[in-house]
Each structure stands twice: as C-alpha cells, then as structure tokens.
Amino acid sequence: MFNEEQFFKDDKLVIGDREFTSRLIVGSGKYKDFEETAKATEASGAEIITVAVRRVNITDPDKPNLLDYIDTSKVMILPNTAGCYTAEEAVLTAKLAREALGHGFVKLEVIGDQKTLYPDMVETLKAAEILVKEGFTVLPYITDDPIMAKKFEDIGCAAVMPLAAPIGSGLGLQNPYNIIFIKEAVNVPVIVDAGIGTASDAAIVMELGVDGVLMNTAIAQAKDPIKMAVAMKYAVKAGRLAYLAGRIPKKMYASASSPIEGMIGR
C-alpha cells in the first residue's frame, strides 16, 4: 500500500544535536490566548515553537504560562530575543531563557529599526559570537545577505534564518535569488523566517531547497488559525517534496504530452 510518509521518514531537519521531522517552525505571538496557540501548534505538526522571552510568560508559575499548554515532550520551546536592540540585551535574555528552559538553543534577534523590524547585523553578529563561545546553539535572524550568512556560519552558528520579507508583512518571498545564494554559501540549515502570508508562500520558499520555514502572523492572524496551521503543514511538505522530486526545466515553447505518431492523418 502506498504511504506518502515514506518520503519524509528519513528526511530530517538537523539543528545542532537535535533532529526534527517537521520543517515548519511556528511562533507563539498574536494568538487570542494560550489555548489557541496550543491548538494551532498541534494542527501545524510543528516540533519547534518560538517564544519571545521578554513577552511570553514561561517562568512565573503564578501567571498564565505557555508551558502549561504545550507538550514539551513533543515540541521544543525555542526562546527568542525579540524586543532586543543591542547585543548586550540579547545575550542577557538568552541567558535567562537557558536558565528557565534548561537548554541552550536560542533564536537570536537584535532589531535595528522599529518600522521595518530589520535585524541589526553588527549587533547580531556581536551577540552571536558571545553566545556561541558560551555554549549556546545559536539560530540568528538575519537579512538575506549571503556574505553575512557565511560570517554567522564561520563563527559557529547552528543555522541561519534569513527573512523572506519584513516581520508580519505577509508579503511572501521578495528576493528568491538571495535565498538561493545563501543556501549555496553555507553548510548549516537555512530556515527562512518572517514575511510568509499564506500557504503558497511557504511552498515557494521550500521549493528553493531551504531546510525549513518559520512563521507566526500568517497563522495567528488568519481568519481561522487552526485551518491555516493545517494548510501550512501541507504547504511545507509539498514544497519540500517538490524540491526533492526536481522540477522540470522552463522552456519558451510547448512540448506535447502525447506522441503524434499514429494520429489520424499523420
């Protein structure tokens, strides 16, 4: 009996010392409550959920806590340093997260501009160097610059996370060629982060051969977040499988699907 899961069984996403079956990473912000966050995460099939340490409670047991809703035996909590504008703030936030969660994985964000929420590459690189030296598994949020992506790999980051478009914009992938250049430049996983708007955006990104995609607003702010989470699960799988299958080359003119030999009048 045909089983489509055979195509994904051995196709793991490896980050640092961990393996994941799903290549979709989801965020935890912008949902109406933690219950909806948990339902959407489960529906997406994601095995990693990012959490803004400065905005989402994961430490105070006397307040609503995301950890009460997420099964951490199935889903890894990936803390991020969202809201940090300097390397020093990001390093401190990462250390607090490691103490709270008991692991050193961190999605590193150091924002340089409030309007675009573009990352400050100088401060991000500075923070990454410190965190790598202190034993963290660092996944930096970066611009779609292949030169900078290589620098982050060279200092020991476990993955790079270039943006598709500004955070929360829903614009979809704006510069596919730079993402391809990044994928060619580095040997660590490339996880496209930010700017996804709908399922087709996720599929297009994955068709480029990147290792994963991270999204939050596209699911959390959809009219029906649970349905969109399911759509994204299948979009990421479809894009990955299409990449592995190999698309046909683009041609200027038509190419008939059926042979003309034996046709009447031929």
Curated annotation (Swiss-Prot):
Binding site for 1-deoxy-D-xylulose 5-phosphate: G168, A194, G195, N216, T217
GO biological process: thiamine diphosphate biosynthetic process
The keyword Repressor is annotated on this UniProt entry: no
Residues at the catalytic site: K107
Quaternary structure, from the entry: Homotetramer. Forms heterodimers with either ThiH or ThiS.
Similarity section: Belongs to the ThiG family.
Role played: Catalyzes the rearrangement of 1-deoxy-D-xylulose 5-phosphate (DXP) to produce the thiazole phosphate moiety of thiamine. Sulfur is provided by the thiocarboxylate moiety of the carrier protein ThiS. In vitro, sulfur can be provided by H(2)S.
UniProt name for this protein: Thiazole synthase
